[in-house]
Amino acid sequence: MSVVILDFGSQFTRLIARRFRELGAYSVILPGTASLERIGQENPQGIVLSGGPSSVYDERAPRPAPGVLELDVPILGVCYGMQFLAHEAGGDVKRAGKREYGKADLTRYGGQLFEGIQGEFVAWMSHSDSVTQLPAGYEVVAETEDTPVTAIENPVSRRYGVQFHPEVVHTPKGGQLLANFLKICDVKRDWTAAHIVEELIADVQHQVGDSGRVLLGISGGVDSSTLALLLARAVGERLTAVFIDHGLLRLGEREQVEAALRPLGVNLVTVDAREEFLGSLRGVSDPEQKRKIIGREFIRAFERETAKLGDFDFLAQGTLYPDVIESAGGHHGDKSGAANIKSHHNVGGLPEDLKFKLVEPFRTLFKDEVREIAQLLGLPDHIRMRHPFPGPGLAIRCLGEVTEEKLEILKRVDDIFISGLREFGLYDGCSQALAVLTPIQSVGVMGDERTYSYTVALRAVTTDDYMTAEWARLPYEFLATMSNRIVNQVHEVNRVVYDITGKPPATIEWE
């Protein structure tokens, strides 16, 4: 049982799915044009038609497959979805005289979607088309000053529409509205971390069988670490997790990963490949070349180690739902568990000729759901809530050639910055924070002596999706404290700068 979200190109479609799941209801995203058969495979109790950039009166506008609107389940249209419902039922949709974008107050609201909601209702608008004439059987249940038809419903056919985005944080009571839709759909709200873990373990045991051996590459991040714990519960000693220390990790990271996973029953093999990686990177300054070399060395190290460990039947990967969503802008990944191995962002790509079957337990989960599972499985918070860390590690935060000396400098600076964020209670408010060792050296004075030392850049950002990001407005006093600590504790550095560039135009990482 699920809520199926048909995606017509809205940037917020994933948020709809996440909001339903936060409310305890399993939801899936399919292309807006998904066939009736494909939708039926999800056994939907309700359907959502997402927003999108198209206009319903455009002949090229995407439309649900024939028969979707006739299904005997409640349907909620959001923005474009509402306009489509009205248009298909015989109503009129026209270009709005005034485009509405941003926050708007509902001047009145009611009906089943708004049941139990009281007080001011602020909605996030983003539309240039409007419903100008209602189809038969529908009634207006909400309006704003500029949009007389802001929400509609047909309680007999159980068709509902809103001309705003209930899924975004800018619509504070949107969660209550979505909860009301779930109530209308009579969805069982049992999508909890405990339920997910129980189902995933059963699925893995069914796929792997009683004797299958599973190989997993560990990066030290939350996804692969959580996957290791889940697989250990599912298949025990038949899991072998391989952690490759390439010398590009953060300070003490190898020891932290070993201390976190081994006591929880993970059969962990650590490979010391620092010499091979750093040797291959010697003399290389180009960022793309560094990435390629690291990817190649990962494959070599992984192949060397797996050759020692014997035969495996399955390769586990921490693929997440956003990687395989059947969206308007992409294609659905193969669900067959077939043998072609795709590159994993944490290990720089695995060889295509590894003839394993894939085990991807997290392919239906969002990142926040993995974190919830991690907590249930006992993963320590310092790993569970850790910021994203790139597969190439500190190599792409050490601008120019990577050397052991530079890495040691960067590790200490990074540790001071991240530890400081935790100490000041700022870490969880940042989506990602990092230090960059630049190739810039500048003149300074320490004591009575002239210095000519490195410049480091600190960067922290906030983001919901990592597609765009804002630089984090960290307090001046905190930044001053960090600068003081860094130049006093890391003598090879005499200048600290803070990156205040958003994404775009910059990327989060410097390389």
Swiss-Prot record:
Keywords: ATP-binding, Glutamine amidotransferase, GMP biosynthesis, Ligase, Nucleotide-binding, Purine biosynthesis. It comes from the Bacteria. GO terms for molecular function: ATP binding; GMP synthase activity. The keyword Nucleotide-binding applies. Residues 191-386 form the GMPS ATP-PPase domain. Transmembrane segments: none annotated. Residues 2-190 form the Glutamine amidotransferase type-1 domain. InterPro entries: Class_I_gatase-like, GATASE, GMP_synth_C, GMP_synth_GATase, GMP_synthase, GMPS_ATP_PPase_dom, NAD/GMP_synthase, Rossmann-like_a/b/a_fold. Homodimer. Catalyzes the synthesis of GMP from XMP. This is GMP synthase [glutamine-hydrolyzing]. It comes from Deinococcus deserti (strain DSM 17065 / CIP 109153 / LMG 22923 / VCD115). The lineage of its organism: Bacteria, Thermotogati, Deinococcota, Deinococci, Deinococcales. The gene is guaA.
